[in-house]
Amino acid sequence: GLGDVYKRQIADYPSNINLIVSDDGYGKNEYIETSRPIVIVTAPGPGSGKMATCLSQLYQEHKRGVNAGYAKYETFPIWNLPLKHPVNLAYEAATADLADVNMIDPFHLEAYGETTVNYNRDIEIFPVLETIFRSIFGECPYKSPTDMGVNMAGFAICDDEACREASYQEIIRRYFASACAVKKGIAMPAELRKQEMLMNSLHLDVSMRKTVPAARAKAAETGAPAAAIELPDGRLVTGKTSGLMGASCAALLNAIKLSAGIDDRVNLISPMVLAPIQHLKIEHLGNSNPRLHTDEVLIALSISAVTNPTAELAMEALASLRGSQVHSSVILSSVDEGMFKRLGMNVTFEPVYQSHTLYHK
């Protein structure tokens, strides 16, 4: 099985270099046994302790007579793209909650006379990192944060326009994510202001995401929540709220039909199948909303596929939805949002709740 080791908290980390690079600092951490010459250190996200783990291990290896090295593989920002290239700005949008800012690497500029892009956290920590390296090895092998990175992504770009367009779409998606996070009270308004600034700097508008005007128009037409889905080939469908199911379910079924070439008038799931599910939800499970969620509709579709060849065809078309774009005119439930993501669909929604209840799932 997998082993585990303890990492101790070090007082005044990372500023107290003398303490950090001592037996009372990194020396208190447990040594990680390895069997290969190259070890990859990965973690769930930023601030998880990847760099601290690597530096601690360097200290531990040095004590054992092994002069190990360290390099960082990080895709964004891309060091050899312009500071304000949309790809690099998309990285800022993705890390708006961390307040990351792309910057010209001053250490690289001074050392090599070359302009490269890095981000504030790496630039701010580099003097500390440099001192730690010198304390362990007597010298630092890197002259800049850019030196420390391993990143060839910029050389792999063969269609700059496609990368720019993908970046625009990512920034718009991140804008909606931040707007909804602020609405839910799990993010500060400053995060949304950062996204708005990035949108304005590139002259972006949310209508550039095709599903947004489509969902808004359907909601205005019906006076109820609506959703829109853009298939990978660019075709667009919408879904409206009904007594049987929510707009997300309707849009999902319509997308499946379109992808599978099934006539829009065909009912994939018999009302006789849906009615007992609604009865179960209301009468036995205590739900007040009889409309079905996406997971319930997909289960009903899979049951129908046993006896209905058209429903079976629809089930097989689910995989073709991966990479589709989804937008809802209201904040989706965690169930519906999670289901779209599990299907590999990129989902956004307006920062508006469907109801005015105090608690939202």
Where are the model-predicted features located?
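N-terminal pre-Walker A segment at the start of P-loop NTPase domains
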Residues: 7-28
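Glycine-rich phosphate-binding P-loop
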Residues: 38-62
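N-terminal leader/propeptide and maturation segments of large enzyme subunits in energy/redox metabolism
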Residues: 122-191
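Phosphate-binding P-loop
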Residues: 30-36
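Conserved mixed alpha/beta catalytic, RNA-binding, or beta-rich assembly cores of soluble enzyme
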Residues: 38, 73, 78-84, 194-295, ...
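Conserved nucleotide-sensing/catalytic segment adjacent to the nucleotide-binding pocket
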Residues: 80-127
